[in-house]
């Protein structure tokens, strides 16, 4: 096999490859609608919005009111932003870069 991945690691890699193969927003909607429950999709969207707000310097109280998410979840997201692998920050910066192309000129 040569890749060094076994069992669940290979399964996870294959799922990430499936996500990376999606080319349009419609494909994403269709894939995630089949893969996840409405609640799971909503939870992911809330976490991403909370991460954006944390990166923008918003307080926990502001985030709770705007996103209707628990302070425990906000705290976990904040720990990921501060000490994690950088996934939230990198993804949010990429999305913001595509939404505001003038900033890159």
Please state what every model-predicted region is.
Residues 44-58:
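Short, amphipathic alpha-helical "recognition" segments used to contact nucleic acids or chromatin
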Residues 71-94:
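C-terminal structural segments of small proteins and small subunits
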Residues 57-64, 86:
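Short helix-capping/linker segments at secondary-structure and domain boundaries
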Residues 91-105:
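Intrinsically disordered, low-complexity basic tails/linkers immediately adjacent to helix-turn-helix/homeobox/MYB/SANT
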Residues 15-22:
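Short, charge-rich, low-complexity alpha-helical interaction segments
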Residues 62-67, 74:
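Short alpha-helical "recognition helix" segments of helix-turn-helix
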Residues 1-7, 11-12:
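Single conserved hydrophobic/aromatic residue that forms the stacking wall/gate
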Residues 26-46:
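Short, Lys/Arg-enriched anionic-surface-contact patches
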